[in-house]
Structure formats: C-alpha cells, structure tokens
Amino acid sequence: MGRQKELMNRCGEMLHIRYRLLRQALAECLGTLILVMFGCGSVAQVVLSRGTHGGFLTINLAFGFAVTLAILVAGQVSGAHLNPAVTFAMCFLAREPWIKLPIYTLAQTLGAFLGAGIVFGLYYDAIWAFAGNELVVSGPNGTAGIFATYPSGHLDMVNGFFDQFIGTAALIVCVLAIVDPYNNPVPRGLEAFTVGLVVLVIGTSMGFNSGYAVNPARDFGPRLFTALAGWGSEVFTTGQNWWWVPIVSPLLGSIGGVFVYQLMIGCHLEQPPPSTEAENVKLAHMKHKEQI
C-alpha cells in the first residue's frame, strides 16, 4: 500500500503541469466534454428510441445536471465557464484576462467535439440502424440533431437569432447574480447546482424553437464532429445556413446580459471595501485576478 501510494505520488509529480493557463484549459476541455456527453447522450436516447426512453423533460434535466457535474469537476481549476459566452462576459467585465478568451474557447470547443465523439461511439450501432444505415441530417429519420441544434420548421432567421440572444442574456444575468458576492450569495458549495437549475429553467422555457444552444462551443464542436463523421457539409447548410446563429448570437447575448445586470443590479449594490484586490466571484470559490 505504501509503495503504491509513493509510486502514485511520483507519477502525479511527473505529470503535473506547472503552466496555470494550460491546466485551466484542460479543465475547461474536460468540463465541456462532460456537459456534451451527458446532454447529447440524453438526446440520443430519446431520438433513437423514438420517444420511448425519455422526452423533452429528461433532455432538459440531463443538460441541467450535466452542467452541475461539469462545474463540480472543473470549477476549482478553471472556474468552469464551459461556454465561450460566459468567458466573453467575464473578460468584458475585466474579471478574467482577455488571453483566456481564445484559449478557453478552443478548449471548450475541443471538449464538446470529443464529447460528441463519445456519444457517437456509444450509440454507433443504433445511429446507423435508425435510418437504414444512412446518416440523415434532418427529417423524421434525422440524427444530426442529436449533436447540434437546428431550427424548427416555423422559425425564421431573425426570430432564431433573437431566441439565442435572449436565452444567452438570461443565462448571463443569472450567472452574474450567482457569483456576485454583493448580491444574495448562494450558500458555499451550491453554486454548481444553482447554475444547473438555471440551465434547466432555460431549457424548459426556451427550448422549443431551436434547442437553446446558448453556447457556441457546445453547438459548433459537435456540429463539426458530425460533418467529419459522415453527415457531411449539410450540417452547415441546413436551416438556411443556421450554423452561425448559435455562435454569433450567444456572444452578443452575453454582452446584452452583462449590460442588463450591471445597469439594473450590479451598479446599484452597496459594496463594502474589499479585503483584497481580487474578486472572489468564481463559481468554485476561485479568485478572478490571477497570475497566469
């Protein structure tokens, strides 16, 4: 037992990454992988069973709890943004350095890509059998929607853009309230569960139009995977070239959420003098102003 523990400690020392930003990027990658693996896995179960093994509520529950678990896994290392829109908002508020935006975004997109790959491997036989050994993007036998979001038939581009903007703005407003130490603070340790509840509420109230991506990495990573895995370029052209909406609109929505929260809440809170220069407003009790 003692020798095994010593060996494990040595391996841990050898594998330890000293560059903090790289450690944080790895945590974002794993956290987003967990989010997509559980979230898209629930969609796969519903779609491939044609509704006999779940439904709209189970999908939203899975995504909500997936966010909670991802924050618990990655939060202490990176803050568990899991979403370029969240990272963008934090950088815009000067709570994170701008260098983190491209690095976190790349890590989150890679994690989403890998999470989609795991779901594809897990349901490989079922996906191929679903449409008679074909990979169909849309329609009654479509399976690309397991991985990325697509607009409903009634939805036009303008309404879809607004849908993603409002969903992301709502997410950011709630996240900022949760991590704001001067507002009603969430009890220590419950931040992850509260953010998961926010995602669940957004899904059950705003998921009908286009599946509430509200996360560029969660949508683009799996979409890119499906393009490479056999669904082809149609995943980008379907829905009047819908693919760019879940990327651009959430980023704009994140800024909208920042302005709404700051103008209506954040700027008016009584703020006692901070004990340190750092702001303790991360989802997992980490300091925002860190040395990279």
Curated annotation (Swiss-Prot):
Motif window: NPA 1: 83-85
Primary site of residence: membrane
UniProt record similarity statement: Belongs to the MIP/aquaporin (TC 1.A.8) family.
Regulation: Channel activity is inhibited by mercury ions.
Catalytic activity: glycerol(in) = glycerol(out); H2O(in) = H2O(out); urea(in) = urea(out); H2O2(out) = H2O2(in)
Assembly with partners or alone: Homotetramer; each monomer provides an independent glycerol/water pore. Could also exist in other oligomeric states.
Gene Ontology cellular component terms for the protein in this record: basolateral plasma membrane; cell-cell junction; cytoplasm; plasma membrane
Origin species: Rattus norvegicus
Coiled coil: none
Gene3D superfamilies: Glycerol uptake facilitator protein
Gene Ontology terms: biological process: cellular response to hypoxia; establishment of localization in cell; glycerol transmembrane transport; odontogenesis; polyol transmembrane transport; positive regulation of immune system process; renal water absorption; response to ischemia
UniProt-recorded name of the protein: Aquaporin-3
Keywords: Cell membrane, Glycoprotein, Membrane, Repeat, Transmembrane, Transmembrane helix, Transport
NCBIfam families membership: MIP (TIGR00861)
UniProt remark on domains: Aquaporins contain two tandem repeats each containing three membrane-spanning domains and a pore-forming loop with the signature motif Asn-Pro-Ala (NPA).
Site (Selectivity filter): 63, 212, 218
